[in-house]
């Protein structure tokens, strides 16, 4: 038990502590930036200064600091996060490390993401579940390519709150002029980001603890909040609840003949008992009869809650269907444009079929065309015949069936999908819907999916056979 928990238990008692803890809001955030900007040290400082470290953890850090630490005689707080042996020996972050802590105001889940360019896919994975990005900048180096890269990816993945932490201010003598230079440079770059992004910029020293949990005595010229105060105050719940109601069905719950409900987690918006709803893609409508949870029925539920909905009418709804409010504007299409982050050595090439999973729905998709690849160091675009490992580009997709979806910026759960290799079952990429295109009408055919894949395989490996492209025949 850490000292913060002990203090709260002494003040509130066990029942009071558990009740308070249960009703705290949750913020998921990631730390990112260039290599050796101090991301892991910052998280270690947050945990240490908010008294979230157990005594045995602190003892282990003191011991390991003498062997692989980089802070001399002081404990290397980065070791609280860098758990892999390779990370500790190299002094870098490779995998996405998740840490949990809480204060009296809020609960937090931190994703510590790698800074190296070759681990961009790991960083994208960490960002996909977060609400806010803490982007670190070394005060000595300023805004680097990797800073721009991670800002772009965080923005692409729909994060609307950025905290830019100018770290290592102790190494530039806590210079206000240097901080203002970096602030101006980053704000100029941020004008190229999509949508409206809330950006706050603060000077910190993760090593010394300045402006992390406590205000700095060395930077009296900074009058803003500390990093922890920003994290405790940012409101992400209202944004999710303000969106249109989206409920991807994960499971049809039928424990007996008298009960049939549809289980899942509300992606956005609010639903109430008595609301008129429509199930997609069938288009059938009904009314919400009950909102069932483990703790009892609710009159209304909002984004983030896992619930089971029962309806007044018996309509056909299956796993992967989407329940929305009646009359909601939802795209139903098999043709779309999506930004893709590619995560495997074998490049993404047009014409190949992949398994697609989107909001509980599984289908088959194909890249028809790569419109462009992003140079995510300067946000420029260039033409590309394929997407390499860690490449990000805008691709045109067709699916085997029409699917109800949203733009990713509007709702990540119903606008994001994963791409799976059909032979190895490995997740090879992530897609974010940017635009729904005119639906492609496919002619009826006697060709099965297996025959189409076999045809593609033959044309690839035995071109001298001059086999015709069956998929092209279907378009005629």
From Swiss-Prot:
Its EC number is 2.7.7.4. The gene is cysN. With CysD forms the ATP sulfurylase (ATPS) that catalyzes the adenylation of sulfate producing adenosine 5'-phosphosulfate (APS) and diphosphate, the first enzymatic step in sulfur assimilation pathway. APS synthesis involves the formation of a high-energy phosphoric-sulfuric acid anhydride bond driven by GTP hydrolysis by CysN coupled to ATP hydrolysis by CysD. This is Sulfate adenylyltransferase subunit 1. Residues 91-95 are annotated as: G2. Residues 24-243 form the tr-type G domain. Residues 112-115 are annotated as: G3. GTP binds at residues 33-40, 112-116, 167-170. Keywords: ATP-binding, GTP-binding, Nucleotide-binding, Nucleotidyltransferase, Transferase. Heterodimer composed of CysD, the smaller subunit, and CysN. Residues 205-207 are annotated as: G5. The keyword Glycosyltransferase does not apply.
């Amino acid at each position: 038990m850490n000292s913060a928990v002990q203090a709260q238990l002494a003040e509130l008692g066990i029942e009071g502590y558990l009740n308070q803890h249960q009703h705290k809001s949750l913020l998921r955030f990631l730390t990112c930036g260039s290599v050796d900007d101090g991301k892991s040290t910052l998280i270690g400082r947050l945990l240490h200064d908010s008294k979230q470290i157990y005594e045995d953890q602190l003892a282990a850090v003191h011991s390991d600091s003498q062997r692989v630490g980089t802070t001399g005689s002081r404990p290397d707080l980065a070791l609280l996060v860098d758990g892999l042996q390779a990370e500790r020996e190299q002094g870098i972050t490779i995998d996405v490390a998740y840490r949990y802590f809480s204060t009296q105001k809020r609960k937090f889940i931190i994703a510590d993401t790698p800074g190296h360019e070759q681990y961009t896919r790991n960083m994208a994975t960490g960002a996909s579940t977060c609400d806010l990005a803490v982007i670190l900048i070394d005060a000595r180096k300023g805004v680097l390519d990797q800073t721009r890269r991670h800002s772009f990816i965080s923005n692409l993945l729909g994060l609307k709150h950025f905290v830019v932490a100018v770290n290592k201010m102790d190494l530039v003598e806590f210079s206000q002029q240097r901080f203002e230079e970096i602030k101006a440079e980053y704000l100029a770059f941020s004008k190229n980001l999509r949508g409206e992004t809330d950006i706050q910029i603060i000077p910190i020293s993760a090593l010394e603890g300045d402006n992390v949990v406590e205000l700095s005595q060395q930077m009296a010229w900074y009058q803003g909040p500390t990093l922890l105060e920003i994290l405790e105050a940012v409101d992400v719940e209202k944004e999710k609840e303000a969106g249109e109601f989206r409920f991807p069905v994960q499971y049809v719950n039928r424990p007996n003949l008298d009960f049939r409900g549809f289980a899942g987690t509300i992606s956005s918006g609010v639903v109430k008992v008595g609301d008129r709803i429509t199930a997609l893609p069938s288009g059938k409508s009904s009314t919400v009869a009950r909102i069932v949870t483990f703790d009892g029925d609710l009159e209304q539920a909002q984004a983030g809650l896992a619930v089971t909905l029962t309806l007044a009418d018996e309509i056909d709804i299956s796993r992967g269907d989407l329940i929305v409010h009646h009359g909601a504007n939802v795209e139903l299409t098999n043709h779309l444009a999506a930004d893709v982050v590619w995560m495997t050595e074998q490049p993404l090439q047009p014409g190949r079929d992949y398994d697609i999973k989107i909001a509980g729905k599984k289908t088959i998709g194909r890249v028809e065309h790569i419109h462009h690849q992003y140079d995510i160091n300067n946000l420029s675009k260039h033409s590309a015949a394929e997407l390499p490992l860690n490449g990000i580009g805008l691709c045109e997709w067709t699916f085997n069936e029409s699917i109800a979806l949203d733009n990713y910026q509007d709702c990540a759960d119903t606008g994001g999908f994963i791409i799976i290799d059909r032979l190895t079952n490995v997740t090879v990429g992530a897609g974010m819907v940017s635009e729904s295109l005119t639906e492609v009408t496919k002619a009826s055919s006697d060709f099965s999916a297996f025959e189409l894949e076999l045809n593609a395989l033959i044309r690839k490996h035995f071109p001298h056979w001059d086999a015709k492209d069956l998929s092209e025949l279907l378009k005629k």
